[in-house]
């Protein structure tokens, strides 16, 4: 699976099946985030893959800048279905354009599964998103 985004070129995050590149086409698109989600901006950070506490695999990414709602947030998307399982928005309390830019995954209890994500937003805040529960 190849995960990517449009960066500053648009509001899109996608997953592609690249197991057989000799016959690559439309059927290789596993899913694409809808550009109509008001919390999805121009996501320029990496789309990360995580094994979560529930033993499922997810794509995790920062929402990026210029979303309609102008807040920083984290998306957790089921890797195989493309369904948004969790969307956690940070309450920055400001009246300014913001967005989560880059993230780092953490296994804080050493069990091989991600239970926290750290991310920096456009205005310099560092956020911790607890995914353990």
Q: Which residues are covered by each model-predicted region?
A:
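Extracytoplasmic/lumenal domain signature
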Residues: 1-133
